[in-house]
Curated annotation (Swiss-Prot):
Name this polypeptide is given: Tubulin alpha-1D chain
Obligatory cofactor(s): Mg(2+)
InterPro entries membership: Alpha_tubulin, Tub_FtsZ_C, Tubulin, Tubulin/FtsZ-like_C, Tubulin/FtsZ_2-layer-sand-dom, Tubulin/FtsZ_GTPase_sf, Tubulin_C, Tubulin_CS
Region span, Disordered: 432-452
Annotated site residues (Involved in polymerization) in this chain: Y452
Residue positions, PTM N6-acetyllysine: K40
Sequence positions bearing 3'-nitrotyrosine: Y282, Y452
Lineage: Eukaryota, Metazoa, Chordata, Craniata, Vertebrata
CDD domains registered for this protein in UniProt: alpha_tubulin
PTM annotation: Some glutamate residues at the C-terminus are polyglycylated, resulting in polyglycine chains on the gamma-carboxyl group. Glycylation is mainly limited to tubulin incorporated into axonemes (cilia and flagella) whereas glutamylation is prevalent in neuronal cells, centrioles, axonemes, and the mitotic spindle. Both modifications can coexist on the same protein on adjacent residues, and lowering polyglycylation levels increases polyglutamylation, and reciprocally. Cilia and flagella glycylation is required for their stability and maintenance. Flagella glycylation controls sperm motility. Some glutamate residues at the C-terminus are polyglutamylated, resulting in polyglutamate chains on the gamma-carboxyl group. Polyglutamylation plays a key role in microtubule severing by spastin (SPAST). SPAST preferentially recognizes and acts on microtubules decorated with short polyglutamate tails: severing activity by SPAST increases as the number of glutamates per tubulin rises from one to eight, but decreases beyond this glutamylation threshold. Glutamylation is also involved in cilia motility.
CC annotations in GO: cytoplasm; microtubule
Quaternary structure annotation from Swiss-Prot or TrEMBL: Dimer of alpha and beta chains. A typical microtubule is a hollow water-filled tube with an outer diameter of 25 nm and an inner diameter of 15 nM. Alpha-beta heterodimers associate head-to-tail to form protofilaments running lengthwise along the microtubule wall with the beta-tubulin subunit facing the microtubule plus end conferring a structural polarity. Microtubules usually have 13 protofilaments but different protofilament numbers can be found in some organisms and specialized cells.
Family: Belongs to the tubulin family.
Organism name: Bos taurus (Bovine)
Positions annotated as active site in the UniProt record: E254
């Protein structure tokens, strides 16, 4: 078996975890108490969903997941919520005081008290696996736990499970909707620390999701529940190939092989279509061509950036539902002729396609319409460097005045860590710039200066 263990860190990670597991249960027909009427093999079996769920002798399905937060309130909602019987109590790990939006608390002071317990719980989950393929880690960049504790965990996982792949789903701080002033600090510190430990990181920009909810679903003031359900759909499309049998079954390492040309350039852009409310879906025929075309609209991306200004290094289209290869090939051919999709000159302009015949499921009472087919596009493009540039700029504005730095130093960090992290980010921006340069002509030219 190729099992995956999901780790949900901090408030954002836990709440997205709720949305994801709720959706997985609906997709696989698993009840909130873990029973699965359709599953005839008791205690194990070799079904595809066993990558995400383990089975007990009593026929109960338990998610291979750990929820961690340094303070209890958010996880208490899981402990008392609809799916409280689904999880093993030891899978829900809480500390007593939170990281207070401070990376240093999550990574050094508070985090170190909880890390061994978390790793022990992960080890127990890993022991139940016959062939663990890797970890999916859900967290935000901006929070103290999401940034600090995650980076600590990633470092330790690299030590304990060196060769296993680690994929991140990271919530990028939204420019408009900020929950903390120090988000740029936390984001840059965590990115710097986890850069060498993460194999592939799907960024989700809260603001982009807000806009999609407002524009496509006509929700005037989207709540986190609205956002998380949409994020859940995207995560579900990405992981569907691991949980169902499909024509092209992607395992975790295959994501990296197809999307990551260089180890540091591992931030694919996710785009999902169709995001549409029930009232509209009733009147629209969402063909393969239409939803494929929608994937190339910047409006449907999970991160605010413009791929029309960047170059693509790789592109995967993951379809689910009523889709046949013939339609897909036709849709891609049309897009290649119509759209100005620029690939880097050292990369073949191939689109990798995966098709899963399981149609998309929606949460009852949710905002999304039940559709026959959906597509999730994962593309590695140089345009995502815009997101780093925005963050770096905000970091610079605060760091120039050393604003709020004393909170970090007081928890045992050194100021040098800030400048080191910032230099690493500058190098990352430079890497993206160089990757997008043309290989032959680019040799003789002088490098143009940084845009700061």
């Amino acid at each position: 078996m190729r099992e995956c263990i999901s780790v949900h860190v901090g408030q954002a990670g836990v709440q997205i975890g709720n949305a994801c597991w709720e959706l997985y249960c609906l997709e696989h027909g698993i009840q909130p108490d873990g029973q699965m009427p359709s599953d005839k093999t008791i205690g194990g079996g070799d079904d595809s969903f066993n990558t995400f769920f383990s089975e007990t002798g009593a026929g109960k399905h338990v998610p291979r997941a750990v929820f961690v937060d340094l303070e209890p309130t958010v996880i208490d909602e899981v402990r008392t919520g609809t799916y409280r019987q689904l999880f093993h109590p030891e899978q829900l790990i809480t500390g007593k005081e939170d990281a207070a939006n401070n990376y240093a608390r999550g990574h050094y002071t508070i985090g170190k008290e909880l890390i061994d317990l978390v790793l022990d719980r992960i080890r127990k989950l890993a022991d139940q696996c016959t062939g663990l393929q890797g970890f999916l880690i859900f967290h935000s960049f901006g929070g103290g736990t999401g940034s600090g504790f995650t980076s600590l965990l990633m470092e330790r996982l690299s030590v304990d499970y060196g060769k296993k792949s680690k994929l991140e789903f990271s919530i990028y701080p939204a420019p408009q909707v900020s929950t903390a002033v120090v988000e740029p600090y936390n984001s840059i510190l965590t990115t710097h620390t986890t850069l060498e430990h993460s194999d592939c990181a799907f960024m989700v920009d809260n603001e982009a999701i807000y806009d999609i909810c407002r524009r496509n679903l006509d929700i005037e003031r989207p709540t986190y529940t609205n956002l998380n359900r949409l994020i859940g759909q995207i995560v579900s499309s990405i992981t569907a190939s691991l949980r169902f049998d499909g024509a092209l079954n992607v395992d975790l390492t295959e994501f990296q092989t197809n999307l990551v040309p260089y180890p540091r350039i591992h931030f694919p852009l996710a785009t999902y279509a169709p995001v549409i409310s029930a009232e509209k879906a009733y009147h629209e025929q969402l063909s393969v061509a239409e939803i494929t075309n929608a994937c190339f609209e910047p409006a449907n991306q999970m991160v605010k950036c413009d791929p029309r200004h960047g170059k693509y290094m790789a592109c995967c289209l993951l379809y689910r539902g009523d889709v046949v290869p013939k339609d897909v090939n036709a849709a891609i051919a049309t897009i290649k002729t119509k759209r100005t999709i620029q690939f880097v000159d050292w990369c073949p302009t191939g689109f990798k396609v995966g098709i899963n015949y399981q149609p998309p499921t929606v949460v009852p009472g949710g905002d999304l319409a039940k559709v026959q087919r959906a597509v999730c596009m994962l593309s590695n493009t140089t345009a995502i460097a815009e997101a780093w540039a925005r963050l770096d700029h905000k970091f610079d504005l605060m760091y120039a005045k050393r604003a709020f730095v004393h909170w970090y130093v007081g928890e045992g960090m050194e100021e040098g860590e800030f400048s080191e992290a910032r230099e690493d980010m500058a190098a990352l921006e430079k890497d993206y710039e160089e990757v997008g340069m043309d290989s032959v002509e680019g040799e003789g030219e002088e490098e143009e200066g940084d845009e700061y």
